[in-house]
Amino acid sequence: MKKIIVAIDGYSACGKSTTAKILAAKLGYVYIDTGAMYRSVALYFIQHYINSTNPKAVAEALNQIHISFVHNNKTETCETYLNGLNVESEIRKMYVSEKVSEVSAIPEVRKRMVELQQKMARKRGVVMDGRDIGTHVFPDAELKIFMVADMHVRAFRRQQELFERKQIIDLDDIIKNIESRDLMDTTREESPLRKASDAYEIDTTYITVEEQVDCIMNIAVGKMIELEYNIENI
């Protein structure tokens, strides 16, 4: 049965990852968290004191990095592994968030991650979220979504997410971090964050995760019908 690629882009803390995970499960597709991949690289750079402005050091570091996703049968979630170690919790911490935009802006890092992402999705049937999936990684994706939300709502969501991970962070600090990431993501030279011309924009400010998923699910089914793909098992 033919399957499509669903590319979900947008700003941080708009609900991309949560929505993408649920959508993938409903479609029976593979979920690929590209944000976790860049966070893993950032974590490695922090742990090994890699100078991100030194091309030789960056290249050597990338050759030592192996990222994989492993399904946790107990939690029914996909967890991120860096060089064989589960880093799912560590990469979500604030100190990594403060580094990830800087690291992800490095051309060689993006090139290496994009190659890995394209390899992971070569058989299609994936839901992938990030910053440049629909514009750079898979410009030919059958369905492209671009998610936005109010800044303060995004900050509150991120604060709640961190609280659930037992991290108490002031809301103003989170707003500053998000504003900084937005600026770096939209102004970097290599694959900046932008909405693809054929992407559906969804404002998640006032809608629930369930409503987000239902909205994209309806668009996905409509797209598959348009392409005359089999949707009996969805």
From Swiss-Prot:
GO terms for cellular component: cytosol. It holds the Pfam family Cytidylate_kin. Gene3D superfamilies: P-loop containing nucleotide triphosphate hydrolases (3.40.50.300). It comes from the Bacteria. InterPro entries: Cytidylate_kin, Cytidylate_kinase_dom, P-loop_NTPase. Its EC number is 2.7.4.25. It is found in: Cytoplasm. GO terms for molecular function: ATP binding; CMP kinase activity; dCMP kinase activity. It is an enzyme of class 2 (transferase). It catalyses: CMP + ATP = CDP + ADP; dCMP + ATP = dCDP + ADP. ATP binds at residues 10-18. One of its GO terms (biological process) is nucleobase-containing small molecule interconversion. PANTHER family: CYTIDYLATE KINASE (PTHR21299:SF2), CYTIDYLATE KINASE/PANTOATE-BETA-ALANINE LIGASE (PTHR21299). This is Cytidylate kinase. The lineage of its organism: Bacteria, Pseudomonadati, Bacteroidota, Cytophagia, Cytophagales.
